[in-house]
A protein has these predicted regions:
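Extreme N-terminal starter segment of soluble prokaryotic enzymes
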Residues: 2-5
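Short glycine/threonine/proline-enriched tight-turn/helix- or strand-capping micro-motif at secondary-structure
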Residues: 17-29
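Glycine-rich beta-strand-centered segment in the early N-terminal region that forms part
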Residues: 29-47, 57-100
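Short, flexible surface segments
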Residues: 35, 90, 146, 237-238
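NAD(P)H dinucleotide-binding glycine-rich loop of Rossmann-like/cofactor-binding domains
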Residues: 72-79, 87-154
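Short, well-ordered alpha-helical microsegments
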Residues: 88, 160, 184, 205, ...
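Mid-domain Rossmann-like dinucleotide-binding core that forms the NAD(H)/NADP(H) cofactor-binding site
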Residues: 125-202
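Glycine-rich cofactor phosphate-binding loops and adjacent beta1-alpha1 units
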Residues: 191, 195-238
Length: 238
């Protein structure tokens, strides 16, 4: 009997790091594809910071927590390997919440076809959770305008790096807050940020004053903590 591997969540995380003791590797029987269904072989899976919240028992969150004993939640990209669904054909790529498993049986609900000629890694970063978080936060909440100054914390992360590039393309002055010189070099020289603050090395207040002489119009918060207090002190009135 053909089987595939899945990983279930079996315990809630505490305050410390997430470890393997929270998970269980299981073998599952390959499902039969019924009418109106298709089978997806997952090729790439995204590990996102939001997962910690999904594992936690917070019933008032924007999404219910993962039930213990079930496949851990995650977004992924895969290829349809068998189909009895009129709208989904073998060989097509799909993306959506697939979980920590090699194969997924679906009726199409919650999955979207991938039509862009991009590699799976680009699809998961730009069109999955990081890209959606970046675009919704920047445009629905931040409402940036050309000529303004934006500061992005966690600027070298999956969300922050996209926010910075979008803002730069829209004509903003973009300053990123990062935790190393290597990350600072990357966001400035590779991604096109106008400046970088290494919070582990620089005096935050002094460096922000230097890089934002006209104040800060938009702040995209990814980290929390003392960084935001220094940014707030430089914010322009709206």
């Amino acid at each position: 009997m053909t089987t595939y591997t899945a990983i279930n969540l079996i315990a809630r995380p505490g305050a410390g790091p997430v470890g393997p003791e929270l998970f269980e590797v299981v073998s599952k029987q390959m499902p039969s594809v019924g009418e109106g269904q298709f089978l997806v072989k997952q090729n790439h899976m995204s590990l996102d910071p939001a997962m910690f919240g999904w594992m936690s028992p917070d019933t008032e969150s924007y999404i219910p927590p993962v039930e213990l004993g079930t496949v851990m939640r995650s977004s992924g990209v895969g290829e349809i390997v068998e189909s009895k669904h009129p709208d989904f054909q073998v060989g097509e790529r799909v993306m959506g919440m697939m979980g920590w498993q090699e194969y997924l049986l679906s009726d199409g609900v919650g999955l979207n076809k991938v039509t862009a000629p991009l590699p799976d890694e680009a699809i998961l970063s730009v069109f999955a959770l990081p890209g959606l978080t970046a675009t919704q936060g920047l445009y629905s909440i931040g409402k940036p305008q050309k000529g303004e100054t934006i500061v992005v914390s966690g600027a070298a992360g999956s969300v922050g790096s996209i926010v910075g590039q979008l803002a730069k393309a829209d004509g903003l002055t973009v300053i990123g807050v990062v935790g190393s010189d290597e990350k600072a070099d990357w966001i400035v020289n590779e991604l096109g940020f106008d400046g970088a603050v290494n919070y582990k090395k620089h005096d935050l207040a002094e460096k922000l004053t230097e890089l934002t002489p006209n104040g800060i119009d938009v702040y995209f918060e990814n980290t929390g903590g003392p960084i935001q207090h220094h940014v707030f002190a430089r914010m322009n009135a709206h």
